[in-house]
Amino acid sequence: MSETMTTRPSRLTTAFDIPRAPGLTWYVQAQQPVGYEVSLTRGLLSPANPALAKAVGADGRSGTRALVVVDRVVDELYGTALRDYFTAWQADVTWLVMPGDEETKALEQVVEVTRAMTEMGILRRTERVVVVGGGVLMDVVGMAASLYRRGAPYVRVPTTLVGQVDAGVGVKTGVNHGTHKNRLGTYFAPEVTLIDPEFLRTVPARHIANGLAEIIKMALIKDADLFRLLEQTVADISSDTLADCGADMREVVSRAIAGMLDELEPNLWESVLERSVDYGHTFSPSLELRADPPLLHGEAVAVDMAVCVALAAGRQYLSESEAHRALALIAAAGLPLTHPVFTAELLQVGLADAVKHRDGLQRLPLTDGIGSCVFVNDVTAAELARALEYVRAYTDRTDGPGQ
């Protein structure tokens, strides 16, 4: 008796007989909804205020764990209050105190945060990292959170003015690399940013001015009413008046935050590269990393804005009166208008790097009347040189602040 055996090719072999099959293409399309909260509150470190406890999931019963990363200077000022707060809410906190200055904004700091997360054994979805500090530390911790197991929840508590109106309200994270500012980074939203003006009471005047640069930016490109309010109140703006959060100061800060969020929300991942919030951020990265002694971020932005005001005046986007008002406000905020290393050559270097970042076009935002902006792609080296001379001539006439 003989048996006949028939062997049939498997379905898998047939379907994926690659040499004989035509080309195969799969297309995947997905969406990831993102939502986060920016909340202005008072007395954040008072145990009677549940905002921070709620942000980390603490309910007054023991067991809630969190990693709290604190700026070294902030820890000296508020470390006891922070620890007392979490003790009152019976949270089990692991503490990491780190420097928060621009010179240490590097990948090594990101690794240090992820190492602390690993040693703590933080859970990927239900235990949070809290960063308490300025813009530099928020960028570092945000980047660490975005990379750790490809994303761990985190909470921001900005303690500087620039952190409260700018760095703390968007989704960018990043560190400096080589001679380039924020060359490495990610987009990663916090669950919540908690803003308490009380932290500003201990911020030095220079750092208040640092944050004012970002507020002036929003006024120039988006909010003429904010610009007029700043003209009226800039002489009164201080760490104490901001911390007291009277009606005018509250409006200044809240308008700046609302304006920033209004610009960011429809373009959170920068799919559109014409961004009005890039105003003051075309030439400033090159200046910020080359100045010696170092400039604060807002100081470099101020010098950049002054040149952009001059460029706009040269193109008659701004009247002479408007240009002078803009420069006068920047100077009145205690910010520089010029800097010795800010040469025509450096302007060209900065613009060339911005063109690479903006995918081959300048996409340079310029004010088109106070409170409005346009984008240009044809600024020349000669224009840059004239703009620099315009600002220098203005400072010579007015004895405005150079550097």
Predicted features along the sequence, with ranges:
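Short glycine/serine/threonine-rich phosphate/pyrophosphate-binding segments
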Residues: 136-143, 164-165, 286
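C-terminal charged capping/lid subdomain of soluble metabolic enzymes
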Residues: 3, 7-17, 22-25, 31, ...
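A glycine/threonine-rich phosphate-anchoring loop and its flanking beta-alpha core
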Residues: 143-236
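ATP/NTP phosphate-donor binding region
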Residues: 3-127
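Solvent-exposed alpha-helices and their adjacent loops that cap or buttress functional pockets
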Residues: 30, 60-61, 121-124, 147-149, ...
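Non-catalytic interfacial helical region
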Residues: 114-132, 141-156
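Active-site segments that bind and position negatively charged phosphate/pyrophosphate groups
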Residues: 229-345
